[in-house]
Each structure stands twice: as C-alpha cells, then as structure tokens.
Amino acid sequence: MKLNELHPSEGSRHARKRVGRGTSSGFGKTSGRGQKGQHARSGGNTRLGFEGGQMPLFRTMPKRGFKNINRKEYAIVNLADLNKFEEGSVVDFEALKAKGLVKKQLSGVKVLGNGDLNVKLTVKVNKVSEAAKSAIEAAGGTVEVI
C-alpha cells in the first residue's frame, strides 16, 4: 500500500447536492421543493410540533407537575466508597473531592448504606441514612451531621 493508493471506503463519501443547475440534473427549476406553497418559499417552514393547524399533541395533554425552585440536590456517596479512606481519617466534602468521590458542591453530601464499611472513620456530611449511620457506628466510627 502506498500513499497515492489511499482512498476512502466505498459509500463513505457523498457528492454535494447541487440544486438549480438545469433540468437534466434532476434538481433543476424548483430545486426539489415541489411547486408553490409554504415549503417552496425562502424561509418558509413550520415550527417544531406544528400539525397543519390541527391542535398539536402537546396542547391536547394536561399540564402536570412543577419545578421546585427550592429543591436541594445532594451528592451521593455509598458506604462501599468510604473504604478508600485510611483508618481513623476524617471524611468531609474536601476529602471526598480529593478522592474523586464527589465532583462538585451541590446542596451537600449524603451518605447512603449501599455496601459494607470495614474502616473506622469520622464522617462529617450534610445528610446520612439510618442504615449508613448504624453501619458507620458499628465499624467504630462517628457521624457528624453538619
């Protein structure tokens, strides 16, 4: 194989569609836009969801729910993740971020009880589930809700 023998795979490249270049091209005169009408005009097109004047589907459905502007979102950390820390260390947001367990400060950090904890830790977080709290204390650690 030589550099001058390189070529793209069959069917991977498409010729540009040149419209309005004579009737024998297949896209002359009306350039594939049909005869007259909204879609034949320049800039003439319907908005997203428009159904020709019929009541659109999204307007036939009832409104539901709302976005709570006071919503709090917590970064989730499971017990199994806390095994990455050394015995007796303090686990807070900075420590979790340094280990790559949380990426950004949301409304805080919540520890959930998924997995097993094998090390004694001091955990300082915003929220903790009952299962996680009992597991941390069973391992000899302490939980401080800040």
Swiss-Prot record:
GO terms for cellular component: cytosolic large ribosomal subunit. One of its GO terms (molecular function) is structural constituent of ribosome. Pfam families: Ribosomal_L27A. InterPro entries: Ribosomal_uL15 (IPR030878), Ribosomal_uL15/eL18 (IPR021131), Ribosomal_uL15/eL18_sf (IPR036227), Ribosomal_uL15_bac-type (IPR005749), Ribosomal_uL15_CS (IPR001196). GO terms for biological process: translation. The keyword Ribosomal protein applies. Gene3D superfamilies: 3.100.10.10. Residues 1-13 have a biased composition (Basic and acidic residues). Keywords: Ribonucleoprotein, Ribosomal protein, RNA-binding, rRNA-binding. Residues 1-56 are annotated as: Disordered. Residues 23-35 have a biased composition (Gly residues). Binds to the 23S rRNA. Belongs to the universal ribosomal protein uL15 family. Part of the 50S ribosomal subunit. This is Large ribosomal subunit protein uL15.
